[in-house]
């Protein structure tokens, strides 16, 4: 039966839906490469990499995995393409939405989480270094943000105060940012001029099998936490040495709890397992938090 459910699950994954609100219309989309230096389960140094899209409208910025950006443009849903974002623990960040707040959506087995925090004034210190990044003349600045020192470049040629993740607040688009230890790096690799809606999902509707093996729709709500509480939870669970050997050690076994595991293929043909759209990490790397507090 498990094998049958797995085959059907791949077919219905494409029909996953979200309750979406359009919160603005962005005229540009900035594309960044995010790299994270970490170690695998054997202690070998590795560098994980993924693309991030950033949109902006009327003071709102949305930073989210590029695969999700592509899905929103093309339609449909392929949860397996979200594996890299799940492995790197990169969620969807809404800066100044609601006004004066930062809202983040992130998946961490077995739930989807929504976190909330105040949008603090970011006190950048302008520095003297200059460079040309992605074809844009860039000036430099540094900041201590949530316990991490960031060194960044920005361009006044693109007069929007946005950047990847929660970074922003400079007099121009951030073109490069790295933390003082060189663990995390964001590099601008493209800028797309387009009119696209900025979408905020209130919840997700997924298709799951009932006790008879028939697939039925199910509303999946976000577990709501404060950003500081969720960060503490991630540091405790993902920072445990057991995580890289058994990535779901802190939660009930998927089959024992849900009675099924979905298996689908990403665009590269790799097989990825998930439960109700939440990716199961099969090749975890050591957790490297982007912020310490």
PLM region spans:
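Extracellular or lumenal secretory-pathway regions
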Residues: 19-123, 127-130, 137, 151, ...
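Glycine- and acidic-residue-rich phosphate-binding/metal-coordinating active-site segment common to enzymes
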Residues: 128-133, 137-194
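Bacterial Sec-dependent N-terminal signal peptides
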Residues: 1-25
């Amino acid at each position: 039966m498990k094998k049958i459910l797995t085959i059907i699950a791949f077919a219905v994954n494409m029909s996953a839906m979200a309750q979406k609100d359009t919160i603005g219309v962005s005229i540009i989309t900035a594309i960044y490469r995010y790299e994270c230096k970490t170690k695998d389960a054997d202690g070998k140094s590795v560098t994980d990499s993924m693309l991030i899209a950033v949109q902006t409208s009327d003071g709102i910025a949305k930073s989210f995995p590029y695969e999700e950006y592509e899905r929103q443009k093309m339609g449909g849903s392929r949860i397996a393409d979200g594996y890299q974002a799940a492995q790197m623990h990169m969620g969807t960040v809404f800066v100044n939405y609601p006004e004066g707040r930062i809202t983040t959506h992130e998946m961490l087995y077995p739930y989807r989480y929504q976190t909330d925090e105040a949008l603090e004034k970011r006190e950048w210190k302008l520095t003297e270094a200059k460079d040309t990044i992605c074809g844009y003349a860039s000036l430099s600045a540094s900041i201590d943000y949530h316990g991490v020192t960031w060194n960044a470049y920005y361009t006044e040629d693109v007069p929007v105060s946005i950047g990847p993740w929660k970074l922003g607040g400079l007099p121009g688009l951030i073109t490069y940012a790295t933390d003082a230890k060189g663990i995390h790096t964001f590099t601008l690799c493209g800028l797309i001029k387009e009119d696209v809606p900025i979408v905020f999902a209130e919840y997700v509707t997924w298709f799951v099998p009932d006790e008879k093996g028939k697939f039925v729709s199910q509303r999946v709500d976000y577990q709501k936490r404060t950003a500081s509480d969720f960060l503490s939870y991630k540091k405790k669970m993902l920072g445990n040495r057991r995580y890289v050997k058994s990535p779901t050690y802190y939660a009930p076994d998927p089959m024992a709890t849900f009675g099924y595991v979905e298996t689908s293929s990403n665009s590269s043909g790799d097989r990825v397992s998930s439960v109700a759209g939440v990716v199961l990490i099969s090749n975890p790397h050591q957790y490297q938090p982007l912020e310490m507090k």
